[in-house]
From Swiss-Prot:
Changing residue 138 to F: In strain: MEL14, ZBMEL82, ZBMEL95, ZBMEL131, ZBMEL145, ZBMEL157, ZBMEL229, ZBMEL377 and ZBMEL398. It comes from Drosophila melanogaster (Fruit fly). Keywords: ATP-binding, Chaperone, Endoplasmic reticulum, Glycoprotein, Nucleotide-binding, Signal. One of its GO terms (biological process) is regulation of lipid storage. The lineage of its organism: Eukaryota, Metazoa, Ecdysozoa, Arthropoda, Hexapoda. Belongs to the ClpA/ClpB family. Torsin subfamily. This is Torsin-like protein. ATP binds at residues 108-115.
């Protein structure tokens, strides 16, 4: 954090190196420079102490903490851990060299961790986490319920994104339940997330856009099941095994990404698969939920809770009989009910 004397010195040094005749740098100019420096200093040390500002203090981007948290808490998603953290680190480190926003599309069945990871990204990036004024979240049919209103939704998204980026270029936009949005809703957004995305003087290149969708969840499960039955370990699968499949499915299946110019223009940087949960992963989710209730999952009575939920509430896919259909999505309430 820059001290006021240092800030004032820096501003005055600019005057020194400017190719101006000495007599043209009058006391009023020097006074104006001092006032600017003083205003910036007091904004940083007074206003921004009590209100959220678009600065490093309020946007600490604690990606190392995110990495440790995902390693500790994210269950069954090795591909996500391998790619999300490096993608964020590279985008943030590129700073002024970045030529486009970071655009990521999460795909997978319900209960595989898409919202969980998006929430952790917001918490790591912003001091206020998902409550930050610089985090905007849209929710499927709740925000875009009518197919007939697509044209209006496009304008709504475009204007809202621009307004937010004017306030803070380092904003995060999360679009959840993309598969429940009408086709074409994102077409006007394409120009804002493309290369050299400066619109009306607004720098969009530092922003992050995350799209969450159940689209292709069944495709991921089918492909993973086939791969595993052919003798390959789940943990040996890579992003390249799924990314082409996700891009094709998102473009062709119903939802906000169907036939979208965002895919046609190749502005989505990463299509990330969230793999379906196996029984062992669901057990780990149940153990984590019990720990959240300050219960030891190894105790006999808590082991009984896990066993009862697994046997009575978990259904598996018909094709491979490997993957829990709802993943870990409904476990919170089931554990709470079992405890009380």
């Amino acid at each position: 954090m820059m001290s006021f004397p240092r800030m004032l010195s820096l501003c005055l040094s600019v005057l020194v190196i400017l190719p101006l005749p000495l007599q043209s740098v009058d006391p009023l100019t020097i006074g104006a420079v001092g006032a600017v420096a003083l205003g910036a200093y007091f904004k940083e040390h007074t206003y921004c102490r009590f209100a959220e500002c678009c600065d490093d203090r309020n946007i600490p981007a604690r990606i190392d903490e995110l990495e440790r948290s995902l390693e500790r808490t994210l269950i069954g998603q090795h591909i996500v851990r391998q790619h999300i953290v490096p993608a964020l680190k590279a985008h943030i480190a590129s700073g002024n060299k970045s030529r486009k926003p970071l655009v990521i599309s999460f795909h997978g069945q319900p209960g595989t961790g898409k919202n969980f990871v998006a929430e952790q990204i917001a918490d790591a990036m912003y001091l206020k986490g998902s409550r930050s004024n610089y985090v905007t979240k849209y929710l499927g049919q709740a925000d875009f319920p009518k197919e007939s209103e697509v044209s209006n939704y496009r304008v709504k998204i475009n204007n809202a994104v621009r307004d937010t980026l004017r306030s803070c270029p380092r904003s995060l936009f999360i679009f959840d339940e993309v598969d429940k949005m009408p086709s074409g809703v994102f077409d006007q957004l394409t120009s804002l997330v493309d290369y050299n995305a400066f619109v009306d003087g607004t720098d969009n290149t530092k922003a992050i856009f995350i799209f969450l969708s159940n689209t292709a969840g069944s495709h991921i499960a089918s492909h993973l099941g086939s791969v595993m039955k052919n003798g390959r370990l789940r943990e040996d699968t890579r992003l390249s095994d799924f990314e082409p499949l996700l891009r094709k499915a998102a473009y062709n299946m119903d939802g906000g990404m169907k036939k979208t110019t965002m895919i046609e223009s190749h502005v989505i940087d990463h299509f990330i698969p969230f793999l379906p949960m196996e029984k062992a992963h669901v057990i780990k989710c149940l153990e984590a939920e019990l720990l959240r209730w300050r219960r030891d999952p190894k105790q006999a009575n808590n082991q009984k809770i896990i066993e009862d939920i697994i046997n009575s509430s978990i259904s598996y896919d018909r094709t491979h009989s490997l993957f829990a259909i709802s993943g870990c999505k409904t476990l919170e309430k089931k554990v709470a009910m079992a405890i009380y």
